[in-house]
Every structure is written in structure tokens, then in C-alpha cells.
């Protein structure tokens, strides 16, 4: 416990920084918090080792004293799911089944297990995520809930962009799905992507403003030193007038394939 700050530091060994994906799911059962988990294998066995990462939920549960929740027996990462707190969730197909992930024939079991773990009544499965995302297309780079009936989605109008069609289809699917639950109150807004950079080896960096995080009284979003940073700042300030909005230069961290949301794990109140 840090003096003067409500922060407890846990010294736990990991294999990678992206705790969003291998960390615990903090689930509320009334006033009680439990720790649930899915299985993790470093995004389809792309980046070994992952032994330490896969043990993080159990170690955090022991350190916090929280109760034991569900252990889902399927490969699935925290960055692959976005929920609204009202029984709705969004994910992408490529993160559910695929090479070194889960078998297509287990799809119905996977959906049921995720919905039961998170208390979801509906899980929307988008076909794809951003081009170049080596997580197989996490939703936290594509679209996020900013209210129970409102979603913001990354946007690209470039005629030659591989993301343009993916995001246009995703927007249509989200709008149709959201209206089924919230009718005319359902809203899907767009926020332009920053320019998509490439490394010297040709690897595309899936930079996105969707990788923002909520903190107590604030919102922190990734910046990429481009003109769309100002657009993102204005959008978040308008969407969350009661929060302090801060942008952090994330050009270095995106070179490792993730950003702020990926390297953090929140515990809901």
C-alpha cells in the first residue's frame, strides 16, 4: 500500500506486458467480487512463452482474497471482448476460432461459456478486426461502448484501405444489433483512425484511438502525433464531459503491437 495513495503493488512475474489479455475478469455477484478466467496461449501461440501469464488470474485472486469464479476452458483474451454492463458484448470471429485457438465445431460452447461467465444475454460476433493486428483482430482496437446504448467505432474512408470495408461492415452490424435492444436510442459514432504506420520489415501497426482506458474521474487515450489526435481529444471531451481527458504519446508502445487498453486491466466498482 503506497502512503497517501489507495494503491497496492503486487510483484508478480509475467512473460509479457499485455495484462488485458491474460489477466483476470473481475465479475460482480451482488456486492461480492469474484475472479474468472479464460485460457491464454499468447494469441494463438505466436509469442511464447506464456506460462507465467496464464497463471496471473489465480495469483491475483490469491493476493486480493476475491472468490473464485468461472474458469472457461477455451482460448480467449480480455482485449477480444467489449461489454456494456447491460448484458451485451461484442467480439470478433477470428479471436474465437482459428489456428492454435479454438476449433470451429466448439463455437456454440465457446459462446455459451463466455456469456455465462460475463452474464451476457447477447454476444455480437464481427467478422474481422483491424488489418495488421497480430492478436487476430481484438475488438478493443475496433469499437467500444461509451454508454450502454452508444458505441464509437474506428473509421477509415480511404478507398485503398483494407480497413475501410471491414469497419463499414462492422458499423452496419453494430447499428442493426444495437437497435434491436435500444431502438431509436441506439447510436454508433465514428472516430477516424490515425495513419497506419509500417515498420521497416513491412509489419503494419494497428494504431487506434479505441484503445483508451477509463480511470477514476478520467479517460486516457493513445496519441500518435498526427492531426487526428485533436479530433480524438474533442470527441472524448464531448462524450465524457465529467471526466478529465488526457492523451499519451503511444507511438513507441504501438511498435510492440498494443496500446494503453492492452497493457492495463480494470476492476469495475
What are the functions of these language-model segments?
Residues 1-269:
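The feature marks the mature, well-folded catalytic cores of soluble enzymes
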Amino acid at each position: 500500500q503506497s502512503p497517501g495513495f489507495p494503491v497496492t503493488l503486487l510483484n508478480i512475474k509475467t512473460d509479457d506486458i499485455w495484462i488485458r489479455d491474460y489477466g483476470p475478469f473481475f465479475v460482480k455477484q451482488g456486492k461480492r467480487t469474484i475472479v474468472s478466467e479464460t485460457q491464454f496461449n499468447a494469441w494463438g501461440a505466436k509469442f511464447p512463452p506464456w506460462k507465467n501469464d496464464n497463471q496471473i488470474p489465480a495469483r491475483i485472486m490469491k493476493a486480493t482474497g476475491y472468490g473464485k469464479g468461472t474458469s472457461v476452458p477455451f482460448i480467449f483474451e480480455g482485449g477480444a471482448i467489449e461489454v456494456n454492463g447491460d448484458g451485451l458484448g461484442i467480439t470478433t470471429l477470428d479471436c474465437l476460432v482459428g489456428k492454435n485457438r479454438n476449433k470451429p465445431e466448439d463455437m456454440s460452447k465457446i459462446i455459451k461459456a463466455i456469456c455465462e461467465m460475463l452474464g451476457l444475454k447477447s454476444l455480437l460476433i464481427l467478422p474481422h478486426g483491424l488489418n495488421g493486428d497480430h492478436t487476430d483482430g481484438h475488438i478493443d482496437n475496433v469499437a467500444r461502448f461509451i454508454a450502454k446504448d452508444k458505441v464509437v467505432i474506428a473509421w477509415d474512408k480511404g478507398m485503398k484501405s483494407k480497413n475501410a470495408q471491414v469497419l463499414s461492415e462492422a458499423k452496419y452490424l453494430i447499428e442493426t444489433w444495437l437497435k434491436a435492444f435500444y431502438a431509436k436510442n441506439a447510436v454508433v459514432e465514428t472516430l477516424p483512425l490515425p495513419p497506419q504506420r509500417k515498420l521497416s520489415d513491412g509489419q503494419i501497426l494497428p494504431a487506434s484511438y479505441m484503445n483508451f482506458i477509463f480511470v477514476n474521474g478520467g479517460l486516457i487515450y493513445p496519441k500518435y502525433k498526427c492531426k487526428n489526435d485533436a479530433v480524438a481529444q474533442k470527441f472524448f471531451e464531448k462524450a465524457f464531459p465529467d471526466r478529465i481527458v488526457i492523451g499519451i504519446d503511444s507511438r513507441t508502445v504501438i511498435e510492440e503491437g498494443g496500446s494503453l487498453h492492452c497493457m492495463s486491466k480494470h476492476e469495475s466498482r
